[in-house]
């Protein structure tokens, strides 16, 4: 039986990667990647060659899910990465992690970069109690979402795309 390892990748600075993440990328039999071009750039920077990289992103994760779970079962070590940060945090990956957990496959998540943590810590807002809302809707539902979090007493963290 294989194992799925969720590996956070650097956000902006390629030097912001842990030694353990590098080791997992080196040891991986297969890497599922949000964007194979971005992952290849990271692997080249780390001088890791010869890895099988398969696209797993928002546009194909539903179609690929069953095959991906089967691949995790068959491979010794399968790694999941996103373009930047931790997979499944406002990025693809949640469905694969959940499916592997439901199949009783081992899943590990390495600690590492998540954009909202340094933003929260550096904001000066209270960090002891907060909620994370992900991306706000662009148009439809945006006002409703704002109204639903307006009275929140905890610090509210959300992403805004440029």
Predicted regions and their residues:
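Short active-site oxyanion
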Residues: 25-31, 104-107, 155-156
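Short phosphate-binding loop-to-helix
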Residues: 58-73, 92
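Short beta-strand scaffold positions
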Residues: 33, 91, 159-160
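Beta-strand/loop-alpha-helix module characteristic of Rossmann-like adenine-cofactor folds
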Residues: 2-3, 114-162
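Short glycine-rich anion-binding loops that position phosphate/pyrophosphate groups of nucleotides
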Residues: 11-12, 83-87, 162
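Short glycine-cluster motifs
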Residues: 73-132
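Glycine-rich, flexible N-terminal cofactor/catalytic loop recognition
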Residues: 1-58
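Conserved helicase motor
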Residues: 54-63, 135-139
